[in-house]
Curated annotation (Swiss-Prot):
Descriptive protein name: Phosphoglucosamine mutase
GO MF annotation: an example: phosphoglucosamine mutase activity
Gene Ontology BP, a term: carbohydrate metabolic process
Native source organism of the sequence: Mannheimia succiniciproducens (strain KCTC 0769BP / MBEL55E)
Keyword GTP-binding tagged: no
Catalytic activity: alpha-D-glucosamine 1-phosphate = D-glucosamine 6-phosphate
Positions bearing Phosphoserine: S102
Domain of life: Bacteria
Amino acid sequence: MAERKYFGTDGVRGKVGTFPITPDFALKLGWAAGKVLASQGSRQVLIGKDTRISGYMLESALEAGLAAAGLSAAFIGPMPTPAVAYLTRTFRAEAGIVISASHNPYYDNGIKFFSAQGTKLPDEIEEAIEAMLEQPIDCVESAELGRASRIKDAAGRYIEFCKGTFPTELSLSGYKIVVDCANGATYHIAPNVMRELGAEVIEIGTSPNGMNINEKCGATDIKALKAKVLETKADVGLAYDGDGDRIMMVDHLGNVVDGDQILFIIAREDLRAGKLKGGVVGTLMSNMSLEISLKTLGIPFIRANVGDRYVLEKMVENDWKLGGENSGHIIIADKNTTGDGIIASLAVLTAMAQHKLSLNELASAVKLFPQVLINVRFSGGTNPLESDAVKAVAAEVEKRLAGKGRILLRKSGTEPLIRVMVECSDAELARKSAEEIVEAVKAN
């Protein structure tokens, strides 16, 4: 694979106004993508975005570039990332573009592409776009220019798709649900999905102004959701991130239910229904309790590198249909092609309604092991993890934790940091073990 100059693991991302998140680069990127896609017979691309104020600027620039290459753009407005993947497929568009920086602050933004199948673009297409970016823009003849249009019922189409994953014989009638949309792309989708399925919905984080996305709300900051659930005596709270591909939940007692617990609830329900295909993919950060709980049910479990992209790769490699991260990216491959917060939350609500159990009762099957995370800064070019002394201490700790805990030591890819993670059923043992490793790292 050729080295990438522009595309990272999740498209192009950065601070607005700083290369590459500038209007001139977005126009050039639209043109380059348009040229590559047009050479394969493409004619229409869908463009969706989250609620950042910079989305207007970037979608206009992308559309201009696409038009110059002869491709038409269909705008679908603020829309969750998984909705863009779904609509790209159902509209038979040749590609989809998402303008979002997910859980980042409003002053960041990003651009990523979906294939016609609603999946990540093949590596060879991304590489061809990178190569085209090095060429000067040349505009097609006037008669061949692309056009711009708007799909006005995109939100309604996705709402119906989400509702279609909830069993028709069940209802959310009688449930009081607090929905926190992070002032992001799900603000006009998630509350309507829950309401139309019968729930009483209390909304927070549904008043985007272009600059308040992910600000003290949503899946990455759920204090407001916990408070609202307790204040209103709600049955459950749902928190999505800015682009709607993550979900975190809160039970009626105010306890957070994270991605690991959500993954277990869905896996167990699929197993009961005879719908679980293969096993479950987690990540290096997935709690050991998830692994133990799944294996108790006879469900295979493997770990991928951190990042939903790597989870999906392992799922495809093993032909498994369920995977996710403790951060709330949950991929249910027989329902959508990417992480989908609304679909995942509906899968948990299905289990609640089906068995008439609270979220607290469902999640209690996975008692998460305490996790201790410590970042250790080091100087110099030598990686402390390669030291024999550190390796010896790590091996001793692993031996001590055998069967009841684990360690994960990683060197940061962007800073001179060693990330030390220890988890164990015994919180005090986890803390002492982490401190022991940290001291060894500092000494080297």
